[in-house]
């Protein structure tokens, strides 16, 4: 068993023998400050990975655009099909120029040879490749089937209605392609620690998230040496930004953190900075 596999297998073991975790209100002060700085709603939740206990939250049951954070849920659905013998990670899918949508840095390089399901999930999560996400959505039956998968998990809040890139439109009061921080955190926890996926599939999902290459300016920028993080960011119209993550000290995840914001006129750099500062406060008062 590799060190990574050992780590994920023992997540419940380590957490079960930790002392109770108590959150600190200082982080919520920073979340509220971020709202003021961005002139936008910010949703935040911090969940204990083992128990599922909510440690802190702000607007946990308000809807926010999912943006590209949905890609983790999508690959969870794909892995569920793999576990059921309905899909193979090594199956190669061919695509054409007509399939390409904006921001497809990986799939645009494979028009001649195609990509395996494993490679598409890696591209969707680590590089946020939009065409990869659409191709994977096709394999499960489209956005409505992802929503059905989530419903079967017990998540009756999170919904995907459209494809990339339209799902990032983020129209105010539009419930399409949205989630709530509490629902997303609970669903992510189930995917990473529950019995829905096999151990191998849970490991694969967290490996893809750990290898995320496009979330550097967010929580990762505030992470001390030796800390673990597996995450997925998202960006959308109308100042929307978000991140979902499993993180913790000593090289292993112990909490789920979800942050969403929408409705800001701030630049992308400023949105990134505010989320990074929330992360810095979280870590300081861990």
Language-model features: where?
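Bacterial N-terminal signal peptides that target proteins for export
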Residues: 1-11
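Structured C-terminal helix/loop/strand segments within mature extracytoplasmic catalytic/sensor domains
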Residues: 24-36, 55, 138-139, 143-144, ...
């Amino acid at each position: 068993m590799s060190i990574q596999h050992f780590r994920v297998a023992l997540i419940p073991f380590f957490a079960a023998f930790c002392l109770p975790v108590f959150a600190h209100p200082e982080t919520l002060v920073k979340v509220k400050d971020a709202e003021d700085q961005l002139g936008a709603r910010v949703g935040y939740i911090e969940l204990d990975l083992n128990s599922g206990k909510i440690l802190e939250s702000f607007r946990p049951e308000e809807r926010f655009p999912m943006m590209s954070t949905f890609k983790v849920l999508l690959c969870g659905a794909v892995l569920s099909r793999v576990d059921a013998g309905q899909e193979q990670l090594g199956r190669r899918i061919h695509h054409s120029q007509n399939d390409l949508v904006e921001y497809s840095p990986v799939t645009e390089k494979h028009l001649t040879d195609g990509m395996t399901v494993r490679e598409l999930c890696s591209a969707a999560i680590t590089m946020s490749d939009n065409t990869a996400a659409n191709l994977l959505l096709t394999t499960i039956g489209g956005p409505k089937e992802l929503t059905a998968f989530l419903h079967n998990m017990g998540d009756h809040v999170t919904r995907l209605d459209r494809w990339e890139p339209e799902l990032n439109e983020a129209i105010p009061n539009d419930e399409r392609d949205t989630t709530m921080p509490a629902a997303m955190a609970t669903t992510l926890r189930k995917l990473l620690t529950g019995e829905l996926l096999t151990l191998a599939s849970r490991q694969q999902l967290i490996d893809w998230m750990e290898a995320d290459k496009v979330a550097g300016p967010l929580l990762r920028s505030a992470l001390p040496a030796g800390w673990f993080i597996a995450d997925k960011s998202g960006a959308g119209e109308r100042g929307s930004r978000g991140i979902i993550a499993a993180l913790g000290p000593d090289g292993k995840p112990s909490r789920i953190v979800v942050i969403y914001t929408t409705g800001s006129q701030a630049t992308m750099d400023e949105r990134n900075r505010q989320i990074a500062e929330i992360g810095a406060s979280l870590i300081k008062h861990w």
